[in-house]
Amino acid sequence: MLRHLVVGAVAVLAASAGVGALAPSAGAATTVGISVDAGTSVGTVPSSGVGLNTGVGDENMGTAKVSSLMKAARVRQLRFPGGSGADGYHWKTHTMSDGGWVVPNTDFDHFMATAKKVGAQPILTANYGSGTPQEAADWVKYANVDKGYGVKYWEIGNEVYGNGHYANGKGWETDTHADKSPKEYAKNLVAYAKAMKAVDPKVKIGAVLTTPGGWPDKEKAPGDSADWNNTVLSIAAKSIDFVIVHWYPGGTTTADLLNTPSRIAGVTSELRSLISTYAGSHAASVEIAVTETDATFSPALTSQAAALFAPDTYMTWFEQGATHVDWWNLHNGTDQAPTTVNGQTDYQDGGILSAGTCAGGKCQPPRDTPFPTYWGIRSLTALAQPGDTIVKSSSRNPSVAVHAVRSSNGGLNVMLINKSPQNAAQVSLSYAGFTPAAGAVTTVSYAKGATSLTTAKRGTAGAQTLPPYSITTLQLKPASGTASADKPSPAPTPTAATPVVSASGTTGTRAQAENSAGTPVSQPTPNGTSGGLASTGASSAVTYSALGGLLVIAVGGMLALRGRRRRASHGK
């Protein structure tokens, strides 16, 4: 069965109605002041931070071409076995509990071979929904004792809060437990951790949390004394090593989407506050993992706005202390017809590589063709390597985002993202703690419509012109005769949670935008028989009703349309 992404009606309507702009009208050249303090650290680029989701239905996952593309993008982590399917996946038999779609060359050993070729660390999602602690412990034994793979990170379930506990039993996540409450999940989570660490004490266990600001965060179902996050952490915080959130901020326009990274600081601050409350002396070692993110719930999924969103999102999460960020997805597929977003075809597909899907009489590029989102992620290779120091930087205009990194060779790399679809941006840069060499600088850029990164000598360290809708990374060397900056001093770590304010647009999980019972997300849609989520948001009232082929979810007065569970035929 195909579990594939379907973008909802509100997002599609937003695309057809046009998108917002972050800069003045066409023709105006915006001047933006950028400040970089190379002497103040805001974090370290994590060793396995740049991650990507894979799935058991993706027959091209381990091909030489696909592995080469992932390696070139320096993907450092691969997640397996794939989203909501993980709660139905049985690793020993390479089968789904509901008889769902898998392909022969995507079992665990094949996945590990792919991870090795790419040079990526695996992060595995143990089956909570239809599995047991013993099944998970057996997986640890096979992976780390029998095979010597050394798999370190293990999630316990996918979006377990989507099991129907908050929606009268109508959820998207497989969960065969009679009790679907957060209390029961937490008790079982402790049991999973105990069983798995008995086999290999070095494994790290992750707890599924709701994302602050997104449904069902802060909800309490009948009989609950607290919401999901407080309940789970109050019971299990001392048994876990990392917490898991999924980040799908969306937006009704591309401008909304590109503004959402500004909300990440509030999300991480709230998570840190929760961890500190419940984990005690263990709190400082509990990591934050964002194991799914992309531009779902916005007009752009494959076009340039999504490409700009990708590196901005990765780097902002790293600046806030996240140690893993995994994009959804390697291949995805869709039954949605392509749209036009800012003059560019958007294939409405969450994959970074084309799945070769045809819909609405139009076909994607040949399978494995990189979408702009791939190049957005690959742009990070020009900015940072694992272990590099992220330093403080700021922009005086939200139309240009900035991220800066002190490289291991003593240089300074500065990524500039022009979010205006129409206007070039004149940028004036100032530096503290680093004196850049004079003359033209090496830049690595990705512009709208490009099919590769471009390296050139352009502008100076103090002045650059950024094309519309572009990513430009300056690779600066210290001035001759000057020492590179001293080791950057650490920035203060926030201790109090700041309010999480939802941006206009939508918020939710990827699974809420999928056909809830098809074959895996990576498999192309054969017959276009699925619905999609139009809009959802944090609220207390959730009701369900049937409307034709759709499940209508009323969330506090907002409508969400979700494809009803159905079985589909398969085709290539």
Question: Residues of each region from the PLM?
Answer:
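N-terminal catalytic cores of secreted or lumenal carbohydrate-active enzymes
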Residues: 29-238
